[in-house]
């Protein structure tokens, strides 16, 4: 049989050297082929996008005056004032308490549910598995509005409980209340990490335990739970870092009662202040950025060390479902309570609130049904514009982000570019950049861009697409990367034997094989950018508000009905898009 990888006749190579392929028959530009141009263009674009918000933030933190004033000198005084005058130390402790409690509650919710849904024989496990993922598609801002509508001091459920028993045994406007709401929003992320690990586990370990007489609960305790250590630790750090940077729940719950965390500190000092102290703002942003970068570095280290816990080998069999006996029913109740009280009731109440003039158990809400909240949205052009802007940003941004992520993945994983590892680091770097810091940093970057380019971009949808795109890029990269790594390199080699260069190999072979993964990245990026809002707080303008920033403005004005209407519209858009995308991609092997 002829070996297709045999060195071509006349190839100038050592007898035992690497395979040599025919030189691609394409023109070069300035001494570089088109593949090299793509490599360098990719790394330059990523470097500019990632460094644009970071560099101005660091410079402002070390400057004695705002960046727009000339004659500034470098100083560390901003950091000294941050901890002595701005009471940032207390803010850091509050953030630590909030993020720590959120992480604990998230793991307590997600890990048992992953074990019960994936590894046991509870009834309705498929439905519960899908239901556990849906809170991911809803922004924590909307979830926060829903919880206040139902469980806040004047919420529907709170008012009903107070009238029935005389008191309400919970208070959302506390650190535990904030942490519980955020945990409900973040539990699907930890659940997916643990569920995927359990689905891919080798059944031989459990089979060995069964042969020595171990029962279902002993197998869970001695085999299943220890295997979850890597995903639990990794997801814990991920949840902690997301809690450190989150704005929505602390802004809605904490700010009215004086509870300040990192994100609300930036929001209050950067947006709500009449005369912002940019030095304090830059120093605080730098500290928060360093914290999130450290957490991401720890994540990467733990992910590399997780190979020591590999339990999936060749010819592994899928584990059997464990019979819990009568315990399955309390487990079902636990899951139903989470889904019902954590997501269904708050979101259902928020949707119902959008169709009523008032919403309280003290009066029959069905007697107050109205479309006035939606009429208000349709009558005011600025509200309609926010919906249109969100759709444009999400649609255009999803395409741009997915294309950039695809190119970055292929260059990082399947090229010989000497800096391909740096491309991967740059593509994943934005996961360590909180949304508010991206907004603040890009605001400063646009203000000092050369040739007045920043003034053209600032306050436009293009600026928001850049900010939101940075937030979505790591997820898109992570969605496409496994698909590229699963494609055998022999396909690349065969194309190179035929004289194709790297770029043609990518466009004619790899691009077609990873189309399903590209579709998954497109859906993920669209949903992520549709529910995003924090960078737009600093990058948007009155004409470029998105749904999230408009809901915040309406909430401050006390228009809870209009907030509910906009939230419902965003939920419907997300549900329709995800549903249609699922139908279009049905039959393709996509793991989103």
PLM features per residue range, with description:
Residues 1-44, 299-337, 418, 582-592:
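Transmembrane alpha-helical segments of polytopic membrane transport and secretion proteins
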Residues 26-27, 74-83, 220, 369-378:
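A short amphipathic helical element positioned immediately N-terminal to and/or at the very start
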Residues 34-67, 80-199, 227-248, 252-254, ...:
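Membrane-water interface segments at the C-terminal ends of transmembrane alpha-helices
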Residues 69, 248-275, 362-367, 533-560:
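Glycine-rich helix-loop "coupling/hinge" segments at transmembrane-helix boundaries
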Residues 71, 215, 307-323, 358-373:
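Juxtamembrane inter-helical linkers in multi-pass membrane proteins
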Residues 72, 92, 213-214, 387:
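Polytopic alpha-helical membrane proteins, predominantly small-molecule transporters/carriers
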Residues 201-205, 487-491:
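Short glycine/proline-centered loop/turn elements that form peptide/ligand docking sites
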Residues 209-210, 495:
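The alpha-helix within a helix-turn-helix
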């Amino acid at each position: 049989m002829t070996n297709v990888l045999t060195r071509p006749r006349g190839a100038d190579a050592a007898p035992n050297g690497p395979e040599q392929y025919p030189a691609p028959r394409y023109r070069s530009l300035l001494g570089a082929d088109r593949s090299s141009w793509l490599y360098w263009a990719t790394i330059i674009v990523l470097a500019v996008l990632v460094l644009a918000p970071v560099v101005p933030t660091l410079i402002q933190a070390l400057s004695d005056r705002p960046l727009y004033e000339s004659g500034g000198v470098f100083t560390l005084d901003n950091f000294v004032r941050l901890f002595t005058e701005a009471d940032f130390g207390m803010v850091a402790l509050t953030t630590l308490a909030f993020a720590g409690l959120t992480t604990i509650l998230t793991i307590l919710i997600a890990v048992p549910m992953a074990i019960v849904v994936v590894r046991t024989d509870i009834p309705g496990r498929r439905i519960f598995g899908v239901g556990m993922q849906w809170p991911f598609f809803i922004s924590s801002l909307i979830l926060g509005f829903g919880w206040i509508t139902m469980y806040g001091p004047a919420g529907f459920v709170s008012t009903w409980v107070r009238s029935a028993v005389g008191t309400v045994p919970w208070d959302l406007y506390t650190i535990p209340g904030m942490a519980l709401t955020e945990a409900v929003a973040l539990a699907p992320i930890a659940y997916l990490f643990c569920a995927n690990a359990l689905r891919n586990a080798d059944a031989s370990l459990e089979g060995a335990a069964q042969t020595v007489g171990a029962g279902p609960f002993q197998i869970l305790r001695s085999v299943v739970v220890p295997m979850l250590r890597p995903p639990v630790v990794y997801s814990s750090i991920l949840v902690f870092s997301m809690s450190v940077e989150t704005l929505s729940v602390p802004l809605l719950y904490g700010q009215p009662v004086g509870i300040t965390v990192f994100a609300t500190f930036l929001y209050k000092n950067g947006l709500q202040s009449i005369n912002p102290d940019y030095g304090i703002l830059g120093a605080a942003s730098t500290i928060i950025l360093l914290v999130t970068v450290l957490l991401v570095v720890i994540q990467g280290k733990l992910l590399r060390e997780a190979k020591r816990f590999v339990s999936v080998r060749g010819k592994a069999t899928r584990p059997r479902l464990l019979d819990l006996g009568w315990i399955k029913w309390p487990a079902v109740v636990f899951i139903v309570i989470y889904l019902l009280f954590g997501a269904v009731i708050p979101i259902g109440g928020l949707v119902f609130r959008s169709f009523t003039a008032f919403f309280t158990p003290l009066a029959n809400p069905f007697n107050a049904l109205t479309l006035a909240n939606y009429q208000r949205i349709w009558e005011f052009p600025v509200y309609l514009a926010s919906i249109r802007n969100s759709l444009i940003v999400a649609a255009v941004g999803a395409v741009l982000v997915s294309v950039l992520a695809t190119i970055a993945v292929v260059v990082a994983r399947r090229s010989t570019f000497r800096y391909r590892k740096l491309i991967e680091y740059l593509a994943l770097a934005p996961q360590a950049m909180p949304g508010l810091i991206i907004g603040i940093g890009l605001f400063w970057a646009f203000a000092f861009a050369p040739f007045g380019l920043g003034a053209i971009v600032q306050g436009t949808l293009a600026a928001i697409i850049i900010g939101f795109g940075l937030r979505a890029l790591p997820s898109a990269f992570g969605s496409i990367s496994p698909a590229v790594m699963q494609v055998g390199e022999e396909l690349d080699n065969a194309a190179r034997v035929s004289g194709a260069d790297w770029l043609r190999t990518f466009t004619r072979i790899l691009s077609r094989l990873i189309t399903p993964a590209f579709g998954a990245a497109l859906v993920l990026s669209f949903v992520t950018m549709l529910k995003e809002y924090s960078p737009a707080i600093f990058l948007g303008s009155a004409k470029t508000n998105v749904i999230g920033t408009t809901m915040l403005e309406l909430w401050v004005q006390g228009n809870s009905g209009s907030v509910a209407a906009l939230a419902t519209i965003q939920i419907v858009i997300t549900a329709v898009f995800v549903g249609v995308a699922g139908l279009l991609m049905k039959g393709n092997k996509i793991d989103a």
